[in-house]
Amino acid sequence: MAQSVADVMKLVKENDVKFVDFRFTDTKGKEQHVSVPTSHFDDDKFESGHAFDGSSIAGWKGIEASDMLLMPDSNTAFIDPFYEEPTLVLTCDVVEPSDGKGYDRDPRSIAKRAEAYLKSTGLGDTAFFGPEPEFFIFDGVTWNVDMQGCFVKVHSEEAPWSSGKEFEHGNSGHRPGKKGGYFPVAPIDTFQDMRSEMCLILESLGIPVEVHHHEVAGQGQNEIGTRFSTLVQRADWTQLQKYVIQNVAHTYGKTATFMPKPIVGDNGSGMHVHQSVWKDGQNLFAGNGYAGLSEFALYYIGGIIKHARALNAITNPGTNSYKRLVPGFEAPVKLAYSARNRSASIRIPYVANPKGRRIETRFPDPLMNPYLGFSALLMAGLDGVMNKIHPGEAADKNLYDLPPEEDAKIPTVCNSLDQSLEYLDNDREFLTRGGVFSNSMLDAYIELKMEEVTRFRMTTHPVEFEMYYSL
């Protein structure tokens, strides 16, 4: 990746680039793009930006005030590895043309404001994030929703239901089975080469890869672990990681999804988020307390637990998210913390070096907009530090198997998107500090997500026929 405007212009020349792709992320977390020929691109674009219609993005401006600017970040430049014509990609901030400031609903601008807010508090100067997005790769998927009815069909040769099927190339018989994907070698793991190609492309684009493997679900669930980084850069990387994964799968004739729960009866996909806060080169999470944590880290955990249900609206932003957040599928529903205990929603991983001390928030999923999610987690944690919110005693036991009287004492994450949106509506002050999230943005976000809730509520489901048709 390039570092300066001069580097970018050099990339364009050396690679005979034909188009420049300006990319930005919408509220829901989907990257959008517009391409311009290099004949209409010069270094002035980094000062003047590229105009576009903001009213076309759900939850953004109305048509009466829709002019917006895409302001490219030269540090994000790379040559797209999938386009046939040589194309330079630039990640952009969305700014107001009237004053050049970041648009209050632009996720990347929100992430930048979160980083600035951390510094302004004097509590720390750098927040590191390390997400672990899991994903499924299917051979194909078909669905339809209309007045006649609805259906979805997942096609996966690796899935247990394919053991009795005939395939043109034969049926190898080697399959992981339900919850058996973590993690036998090939030929049971059929995605080794595809994941390796994804990793090589990620590294060529400047994202360090640490590990890749099959995940638990036996229908093509996978994970590629990449390195942590600062808030905005790590959010940029997460968007690029999803882009590479989906496009490599596409070149193989497969389809990759980051839906949290596409399969009934097997594990869903999470996106655990590792976090730490530093100041003057020192890890503020390292200390002499429980599991080597500092008081700062414990208060940070306390803030996340206190605001977890409001956070769910951002970290688990789909109706499908809450089909994952149920007991029995390794989903972290209990709002507790523990060292190495994966049944707690916040885990403190073992590290040999205090520099690596961090916490792992386990309830987020890969539908999460990384710019919004990382920012919200940071704001919740900082609220805990500023208000000295202690999380209580650690939960060093299996939270999936507690006696009823103990189980009732431990709070849980939300059980639906609409519940989480209600919590967000009533618990938002920690997000609006320093102007990081605006009330206008949160109102628009809640309205946008309630449209999803309403659509889901109004759609008759096949399970309802199974339960009620003959009564």
UniProtKB/Swiss-Prot annotation:
Family label? Belongs to the glutamine synthetase family.
SUPFAM superfamilies from the entry? Glutamine synthetase, N-terminal domain (SSF54368), Glutamine synthetase/guanido kinase (SSF55931)
> What taxonomic classification does the UniProt entry list for its organism?
Bacteria, Pseudomonadati, Pseudomonadota, Betaproteobacteria, Burkholderiales
Q: How is this chain's activity regulated?
A: Is inhibited by H(2)O(2). 1,10-phenanthroline inhibits the activity slightly, but other metal cation chelators such as EDTA or tiron have no effect on the activity. Divalent metal cations and hydroxylamine have also no effect on the activity. Due to the relationship of the protein with glutamine synthetases, glutamate and glutamine were tested as inhibitors; neither preincubation of the compounds with the enzyme nor their addition to the assay buffer affected 3HAP mutase activity.
| Task of the protein | Catalyzes the isomerization of 3-hydroxylaminophenol (3HAP) to aminohydroquinone, a step in the degradative pathway of 3-nitrophenol. The enzymatic reaction is regiospecific since it leads to the formation of aminohydroquinone exclusively, without producing the isomeric 4-aminocatechol. Can also isomerize other hydroxylaminoaromatic compounds, such as hydroxylaminobenzene to a mixture of 2-aminophenol and 4-aminophenol, 4-hydroxylaminotoluene to 6-amino-m-cresol, and 2-chloro-5-hydroxylaminophenol to 2-amino-5-chlorohydroquinone. Does not act on 4-hydroxylaminobenzoate.
Q: Name one GO cellular component term.
A: cytoplasm
Known Pfam families for this protein? Gln-synt_C, Gln-synt_N
The effect of pH on activity is described as:
Optimum pH is 6.5.
Q: GS beta-grasp domain: from which residue to which, for each copy?
A: 15-100
Q: What EC number(s) does its UniProt record assign? A: 5.4.4.3
Keyword Isomerase assigned: yes
Q: What is a biological process (GO) this protein takes part in?
A: benzene-containing compound metabolic process
Protein name (Swiss-Prot/TrEMBL): 3-hydroxylaminophenol mutase
The answer to keyword Isomerase applying to this record is yes
Instruction: Characterize activity with respect to temperature.
Output: Optimum temperature is above 30 degrees Celsius. Heating to 60 degrees Celsius for 1 minute abolishes 72% of the original mutase activity, and no activity remains after 8 minutes.
Ranges of residues in domain GS catalytic: 107-471
Q: Which GO terms describe its molecular function?
A: 3-(hydroxyamino)phenol mutase activity; glutamine synthetase activity
Query: Which NCBIfam families does this one have?
Result: GlnA
**Misc. remarks from the entry:** 3HAP mutase requires neither a cofactor nor oxygen for the enzymatic reaction. This indicates that the enzyme catalyzes a Bamberger-type rearrangement.
Which reaction(s) does the protein catalyse, per the Swiss-Prot or TrEMBL entry?
3-hydroxyaminophenol = aminohydroquinone
User: What PROSITE patterns does this protein's entry cite?
Assistant: GLNA_1, GLNA_ADENYLATION, GLNA_ATP, GS_BETA_GRASP, GS_CATALYTIC
Entry keywords, A to Z? Isomerase
